[in-house]
């Protein structure tokens, strides 16, 4: 895996950007394969945090958070612009691969755009689909009144027992090594320090109530019908981490985004680490992932096996990407050129189904496509010459062929295993 990534990074440095429509594909590759279908699982783009006056976030700092261009938890104007760029890129890429013709109007069976019924997800899908097929008249499918969580995207626990809780906590604690959750919390010392000084947390109203940072107060709650939950310092500082990340993307002045602090890119990466670890703890323990991702795994499997489908765009949340990847056994990764290392804002897991022309055999390539931190901040236009970041994903226990693809049978079987893992939960 490390060797493959090293080669990929080296090639990225010496080859023109146009080569990287999705992942580096040679002329020989295109002579051998034809793109047949694409299934995308996307995180919504930039939203506003819950940082209004009187909120828990407002009490953690003496400073004033950014005046957002949208209501709390809704897609911002900049988020819409960035998602439009992504849709434009995917349009250029799929046309270049011959999956669609320029300005094609697809049949209802060929393209499926389906969003969770939260405003930020519906809006993200709308911006993407308009740019992806500007004359295609695509409809964003969502099943409930905004803003309501759709059960397909809602990462709630639907099976909870004493045995489940014990196994889940065993797997969660293993993430921190011998020290368990305390070890995980201590790995965030620098992150907490950067957040605390940027917030002026010791002078805040919240500090009077919560006191100093603690490393032994993380409590996990696993309740049927609810998302995995957390209480303690990590939970509180995750809220601040999330808000800072979004403010860093949204606010053109980096010093202003940091409330006047002079933060380096490494400092921002450190701040974002809290959110990455928080997501790992709540959604990536294998038994938890199999539980909360079950409906979405079934839906994605059906889309990959849909006879007439050419393109599927599913818009949800970082918890959806994290849990689906964990349930499928995707190997751990750390993304380059991003302060968010696992599921950056607007990121997309892209399943590409390729047909081997000589045999008709189907193969699948899986990549995580995302805008770099610089691309997000600069509203950088995206096309085949100015592509987003593309990071190839790998699955534990599966081997790619010489062209970097898995057989479709391998991927189908892995989805089947992940779906069946839910039935094994007692």
Positions of the model-derived regions?
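Bacterial Sec-dependent N-terminal signal peptides
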Residues: 1-24
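Signature for phosphate-centric chemistry
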Residues: 22-110, 116-312, 316-426
């Amino acid at each position: 895996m490390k060797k493959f990534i090293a080669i990929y990074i080296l090639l990225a440095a010496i080859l023109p950007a146009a080569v990287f429509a999705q992942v580096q594909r040679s002329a020989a590759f295109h002579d051998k394969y034809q793109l047949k279908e694409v299934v995308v699982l996307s995180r919504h783009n930039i939203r506003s945090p819950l940082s209004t006056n009187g909120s828990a976030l407002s009490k953690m700092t003496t400073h004033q958070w950014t005046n957002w261009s949208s209501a709390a938890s809704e897609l911002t104007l900049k988020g819409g612009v960035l998602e439009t760029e992504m849709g434009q890129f995917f349009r250029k890429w799929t046309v270049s691969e011959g999956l669609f013709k320029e300005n094609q109007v697809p049949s209802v069976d060929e393209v499926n755009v389906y969003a969770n019924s939260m405003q930020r997800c519906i809006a993200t899908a709308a911006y993407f689909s308009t740019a992806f097929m500007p004359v295609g008249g695509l409809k964003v499918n969502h099943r409930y009144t905004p803003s309501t969580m759709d059960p397909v995207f809602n990462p709630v626990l639907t099976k909870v027992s004493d045995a489940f809780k014990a196994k889940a906590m065993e797997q969660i604690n293993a993430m921190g090594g011998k020290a368990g959750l305390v070890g995980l919390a201590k790995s965030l010392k620098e992150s907490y320090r950067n957040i605390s000084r940027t917030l002026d947390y010791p002078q805040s109203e919240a500090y009077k109530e919560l006191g100093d940072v603690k490393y032994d107060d993380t409590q996990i709650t696993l309740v049927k019908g609810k998302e995995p939950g957390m209480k303690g310092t990590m939970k509180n500082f995750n809220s601040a981490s999330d808000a800072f990340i979004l403010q860093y993307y949204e606010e053109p002045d980096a010093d202003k985004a940091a409330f006047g602090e002079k933060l380096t890119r490494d400092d921002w990466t450190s701040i974002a680490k809290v959110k990455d670890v928080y997501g790992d703890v709540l959604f990536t323990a294998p038994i938890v992932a199999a539980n909360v991702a079950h409906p979405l795994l079934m839906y994605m499997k059906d889309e990959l096996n849909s006879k007439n489908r050419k393109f599927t765009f599913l818009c949800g949340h970082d918890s959806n990407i994290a849990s689906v990847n964990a349930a499928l056994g995707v190997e751990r990764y750390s993304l380059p050129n991003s302060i968010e290392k696992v599921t950056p804002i607007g990121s997309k897991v892209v399943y590409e189904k390729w047909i081997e022309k000589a045999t008709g055999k189907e193969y699948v390539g899986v990549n995580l496509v995302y805008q770099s931190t610089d691309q997000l901040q600069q509203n950088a236009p995206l096309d085949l010459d100015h592509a987003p970041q593309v990071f190839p994903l790998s699955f534990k226990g599966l081997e790619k062929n010489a062209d970097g693809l898995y057989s479709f049978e391998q991927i189908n079987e892995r989805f089947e295993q992940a779906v069946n893992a839910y039935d094994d939960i007692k």
